[in-house]
């Protein structure tokens, strides 16, 4: 990369406003009067209303067996008082990471709104019943895709992957419902720490953290 390119990157920044686009005031501890779940759901609804693509997308952080951090984007499919839930192949790279170190972080990045929410804590698999309930809501094509893909494993070509999809499509052609793969299911990140972030002028951002029942403001 040329020096001029780096200089351009160094100058790139967005100046956040002093109020939200909906006219609301600065994020403060009283916004969490009804708990962190209520505020997270409100911000999710705001992101959806703003037309943000996949507003429930989270950047999921894990560490591998060697202690090296890895991130990727997945979709949050449930929020409740215990934490947030996502679903995946248990044999995937993230599944292997969580088997060796069952702890993760997740960030909802709503850049267009100048907002982020960060959740971290221990991770456990959800029950088979909870997995089956979510699985039943997935489109059939997504169900077949989960059977066809040995997630995170190398494959010679896309054509080979499509051949695998065609094979499972034929296998389940006479089935009214597609069963849950044995190596597929949900994980719940128990919300040990939740932080709400709101961009503000001159990088003097608002940060409110919920931890061990305490709600506290953090310096930016």
Swiss-Prot record:
PROSITE patterns: PYRIDOX_OXIDASE (PS01064). Binds 1 FMN per subunit. SUPFAM superfamilies: FMN-binding split barrel. FMN binds at residues 72-77, 87-88, 94, 116, 151-152, 197, 207. Its EC number is 1.4.3.5. One of its GO terms (biological process) is pyridoxine biosynthetic process. Gene3D superfamilies: Electron Transport, Fmn-binding Protein, Chain A. Its cofactor is FMN. Belongs to the pyridoxamine 5'-phosphate oxidase family. Catalyzes the oxidation of either pyridoxine 5'-phosphate (PNP) or pyridoxamine 5'-phosphate (PMP) into pyridoxal 5'-phosphate (PLP). PANTHER family: PYRIDOXINE-5'-PHOSPHATE OXIDASE, PYRIDOXINE-5-PHOSPHATE OXIDASE. Homodimer. This is Pyridoxine/pyridoxamine 5'-phosphate oxidase.
């Amino acid at each position: 990369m040329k020096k001029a390119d780096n200089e351009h990157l160094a100058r790139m920044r967005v100046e956040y406003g002093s109020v939200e686009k909906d006219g609301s005031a600065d994020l403060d501890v009283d916004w969490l009067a009804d708990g962190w779940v209520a505020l997270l759901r409100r911000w999710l609804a705001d992101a959806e209303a703003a037309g943000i693509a996949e507003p429930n997308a989270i950047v999921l952080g894990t560490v591998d067996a060697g202690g090296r951090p890895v991130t990727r984007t997945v979709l949050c499919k449930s929020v409740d008082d215990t934490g947030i839930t996502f679903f995946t192949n248990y044999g995937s790279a993230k599944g292997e990471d969580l088997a060796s170190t069952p702890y993760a972080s997740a960030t909802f990045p709503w850049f267009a709104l100048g907002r982020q929410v960060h959740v971290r804590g221990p991770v456990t698999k959800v029950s088979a019943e909870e997995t089956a309930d979510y699985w039943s809501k997935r489109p059939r094509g997504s169900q077949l895709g989960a059977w066809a893909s040995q997630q995170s494993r190398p494959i010679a070509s896309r054509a080979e992957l499509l051949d695998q999809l065609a094979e499972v499509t034929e296998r389940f052609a006479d089935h009214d419902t597609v069963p849950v793969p044995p190596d597929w299911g949900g994980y719940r990140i128990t919300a040990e720490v939740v932080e709400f972030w709101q961009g503000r002028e001159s990088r003097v951002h608002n940060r409110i953290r919920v931890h061990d029942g305490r709600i506290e403001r953090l310096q930016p």
